[in-house]
From Swiss-Prot:
GO terms for cellular component: tRNA methyltransferase complex. GO terms for molecular function: tRNA (guanine(46)-N7)-methyltransferase activity. The gene is trmB. Its EC number is 2.1.1.33. This is tRNA (guanine-N(7)-)-methyltransferase.
Amino acid sequence: MRLRYDKNAEGKLEMFNYLIKQGDSKILLDDKTVLEIGMGKGEMIVELAKAHPELNFIGLEKYPTVAAKCIKKANEYNLSNFKILIDDAFKVDEIFEGQCKVIWLTFSDPWPKARHEKRRLTHPLFLEKYRKILDKDGILKFKSDNDGLYEFSLSSLQNSNWRIIDHGIDLHNSKYNENNYQTGYERKWSARGKKINYIFAQKGE
């Protein structure tokens, strides 16, 4: 179901002090920062922020109407380590400086048509941007219900000199499920019997 546009969404995020307002300088990342690119309604990142108060979490989302859906839960948890930035993922290396601990790509748009390949968040163009803002020991974490995007992402990472730590086609029956926090899409598709693909990778030399 398509969300109804909320013209006040960005104002709500700012009112509750979740919104990062960009100035002329870049936003600083460090080894205590976890970044989710395309956070959607923020179901996963909000739970992660609650579970890990020692870390700082930033959700990057293009659409304020979607991002604002996380406010109720974030307020309920009284989170002080969670912020949102409204911007386009393609500008990620222009927005941030420094290097973060983790980059999450969760249930990204698969852009299935060949002519849209460069829009996929695991295309080599994006991987080169992530390389600039991920710590040398940092991890890129990917999960998706889309098998085609999973196969594309695995190939793209390998061909772009990223080291695959682990990957698989059934996250919920893996050793990682115990510490897995689900997104809305994840709950929806796994409830219908769809297995969830995952990839964990580090940048190569």
